[in-house]
């Protein structure tokens, strides 16, 4: 037997940052090395995402248990992969995909396949005595490593908050800095400054799932205004040091072909009108990126949005592309969007995640590696962002250990690699 052979695979039910069960997997090698990883879980999900297998037994965890997925790892996946070399990442992932046999991994569960896929990469890296980011880089011959620009979600509306703001996330991107550590510091300072701005206005400063504030503001523009005040208060310049980014998650307020904004007095917009509304915000404020500006099925609307904003700012497809290379290819062919959000639990294996990242890069699309609203202490996405030189990472606000664990891992990686932080160079329209 060779030392890199997988001798055991074990999974267990653990809790995520929302107190819901998720799955953690261990891949154990002949050498005694153990690789471990956890699957995250989303709140606003695209309809074409790979399936997260839940038990549905209402008497346990309100139906959200993952014992079935755990059992799938401990039986089917165990049988499939024990005896294989851990260094064959693609072959391991392809075995799980073929065994599952469904388009959306509904047989094994994408949470089961992903946890094992990532745990295998952790084990392989440890076996080769390599940091995970370097192992991931080697998988696709990525020779340049870069530190990602963080897209920091500091103010929430939509499905992530109980308020009247329609846009789901208002984020800051600290682009005018020369290192990740400095960019992180700027983000943290703005986060603390925003807290004091909200406090002064008598607004709620409790934080949501991703660590962002969710005050009861009256409109989307009011949310932008308080962030700009916070940036100014810290002494940074909005538009040069720090840019704004939005995640509209507009599928959440798209009904019968109309975009209905409750926060704007139940105003309804056609696709083109809503795209024009977003273009108006871009004109008025230092916004560099808009995610899911239109509904995931509104390809015509997306096409129009891309035609008016695509050469000025980053237009990110999340629910639109769901980290799926096939769907991304359609976007490339139809010139829809210019960026993809990468959430590996939307697709269910590391190999397919890398396929999506490199397909995007080959076609001039930017890539943003992302957490989910239900996270764990697992910081694999930090290594993924550096190891693929993705350029950006979206991993929440500047509080809650489930978010900060990723930032801290990036600080360690920067210290180790001295990888370049490209800041503004990552964006169209800023160069």
UniProtKB/Swiss-Prot annotation:
Entry keyword Oxidoreductase: no
Cellular component terms (Gene Ontology): cell surface; extracellular region; phosphopyruvate hydratase complex
Catalytic activity: (2R)-2-phosphoglycerate = phosphoenolpyruvate + H2O
Cell compartment(s), UniProt: Cytoplasm; Secreted; Cell surface
Gene Ontology terms for molecular function: magnesium ion binding; phosphopyruvate hydratase activity
Active site: 210, 343
Binding site for Mg(2+): 247, 291, 318
Taxonomy, superkingdom: Bacteria
KW NAD (keyword) present: no
Keywords per UniProt: Cytoplasm, Glycolysis, Lyase, Magnesium, Metal-binding, Secreted
CDD domains in the cross-refs: enolase
InterPro entries: Enolase, Enolase-like_C_sf, Enolase-like_N, Enolase_C, Enolase_CS, Enolase_N
Cofactor, how bound (note): Binds a second Mg(2+) ion via substrate during catalysis.
Function summary: Catalyzes the reversible conversion of 2-phosphoglycerate (2-PG) into phosphoenolpyruvate (PEP). It is essential for the degradation of carbohydrates via glycolysis.
Subunit record text: Component of the RNA degradosome, a multiprotein complex involved in RNA processing and mRNA degradation.
Family: Belongs to the enolase family.
Descriptive protein name: Enolase
């Amino acid at each position: 037997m060779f030392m890199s052979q997988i001798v055991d695979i074990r999974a267990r039910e653990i809790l995520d940052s929302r107190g819901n069960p998720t799955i953690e997997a261990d891949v154990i090698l002949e050498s005694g090395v153990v690789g471990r990883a956890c699957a995250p879980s989303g709140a606003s999900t695209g309809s074409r995402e790979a399936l997260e297998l839940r038990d549905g037994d209402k008497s346990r965890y309100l139906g959200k248990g993952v014992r079935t997925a755990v059992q799938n790892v401990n039986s089917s996946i165990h049988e499939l992969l024990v005896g294989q070399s851990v260094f064959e990442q693609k072959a391991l992932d392809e075995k799980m995909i073929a065994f599952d046999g469904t388009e959306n991994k509904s047989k094994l569960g994408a949470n089961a396949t992903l946890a094992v896929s990532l745990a295998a990469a952790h084990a392989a890296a440890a076996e080769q005595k390599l940091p995970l980011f370097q192992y991931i880089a080697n998988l696709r011959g990525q020779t340049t490593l870069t530190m990602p620009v963080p897209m920091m979600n500091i103010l929430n509306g939509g499905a992530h908050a109980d308020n009247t703001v329609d846009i789901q996330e208002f984020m800051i991107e600290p682009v005018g800095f020369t290192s990740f550590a400095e960019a992180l510091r700027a983000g943290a300072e703005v986060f603390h400054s925003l807290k004091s701005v909200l406090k002064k206005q008598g607004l709620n400063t409790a934080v949501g799932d991703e660590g962002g504030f969710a005050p009861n503001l009256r409109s989307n523009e009011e949310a932008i205004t308080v962030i700009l005040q916070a940036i100014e208060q810290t002494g940074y310049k909005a538009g040069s040091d720090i840019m704004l980014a939005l995640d509209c998650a507009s599928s959440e307020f798209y009904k019968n072909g109309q975009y209905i904004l409750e926060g704007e007095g139940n105003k309804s917009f056609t696709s083109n009108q809503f795209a024009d509304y977003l273009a108006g915000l871009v004109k008025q404020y230092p916004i560099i990126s808009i995610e899911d500006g239109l509904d995931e099925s509104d390809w015509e609307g997306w096409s129009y949005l891309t035609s008016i904003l695509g050469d000025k700012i980053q237009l990110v497809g999340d629910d639109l592309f769901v980290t799926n290379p096939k769907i991304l290819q359609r976007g490339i062919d139809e010139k829809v969007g210019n960026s993809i959000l990468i959430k590996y639990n939307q697709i269910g294996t590391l190999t397919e995640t890398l396929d999506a990242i490199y397909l995007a890069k080959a076609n001039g699309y930017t890539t943003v590696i992302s957490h989910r609203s239900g996270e764990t202490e697992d910081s694999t996405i930090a290594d993924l962002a550096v190891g693929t030189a993705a350029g950006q990472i979206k991993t929440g606000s500047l509080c809650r250990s489930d978010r900060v664990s990723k930032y801290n891992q990036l600080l360690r990686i920067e210290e180790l690699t001295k990888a370049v932080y490209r800041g503004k160079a990552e964006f169209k329209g800023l160069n």
